[in-house]
Every structure is written in structure tokens, then in C-alpha cells.
Amino acid sequence: MPSPIGHALGGIAAGWGSVPRRNVAAAVMLAAVAIVPDLDLLIHDHRGVSHSVGAALIAGAVTWVVTRSSRWALAVTLAWASHVLLDWMSNDARPPLGVMALWPFTRDYYKSSIEVFPAVSRRYWLAQFWIDNLRAVAVEVLILAPITALVVWWRRPAGAQGSSRGQP
């Protein structure tokens, strides 16, 4: 499963086009939303209901109720769903394998046959802990940072686009 860094980058990339105001606060909010599904680690139910499309839709609905902003609701839904997608595409060696992606329709676990992201170790007592995790984070950053940068650049505010269009 990706690290919080990978999930933060994925959340920003997924939700950036939908937020009403694109600024640092919006990026921080999207990053935080994309990390929230892993709070289930605290109750030892990792990759369950919080790692599903249903949970992403609930998060978006709650956001809409609180903000009455369909754009924020969509951004939150996409940021949360990015977590599910990244975990689905990750190396997973601990049962149950995969994520409960389609809850509430089914409680089955799903795992991609293509593992894009290496597993992040939580076994800090092992000698390889730091090396393995630095390698995993490096892969995440190499894949997700360019995608995130491209999305942020593409969806930059209109005033910031002038210089790239030959305007003074």
C-alpha cells in the first residue's frame, strides 16, 4: 500500500480540477482527504469499508451537506477514491489481499493484477525498514509527482496562464 506521501499526491491530482479555489489550502485539504481512509489502521480493520467507492461517495455527500458546494463534494469524492485506486494497484502481501473497493454492493476484496506501487512496511523493527520504505516512497514520487504537477499546471488560474500564451 502506498505511503501518506503517495496518497497525498494522488488526492491532489484527482481532486484539483474540481476545487472552486485552487490554492495551498485546497491542496492541503485534498491531501488530507486522500490520507483519511488509512485511519482504519487505528482500529485494525485496514482496507475494509473505508477503502471503497461507497466510502468515497459518503465523504462527498457529507462534504456537500456541510459546504453546499458540488465542486468541493466532487473534489473530496475524487481525492478519497484516489486512495482506493492507489491501494488497489499496490503490492499487498497481508491478508485479506486487496481492498473492499465495491462496498456497499459487495464485501469482496479486489486487487489489481498489475502492482504499480511497492508495499510500505510498518515493521519498523526490521533492518530493511528504512531502505524498503525510502524505495517505495521514491517510486510513488517518481510516478505521482509528475502527474500531480501536470494537473496543477493544466488547471492553474486563468491569470497565471498569460505568460505561457505569449502575453506580457
Predicted regions: what is each one?
Residues M1-P168:
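N-terminal membrane-targeting hydrophobic helices
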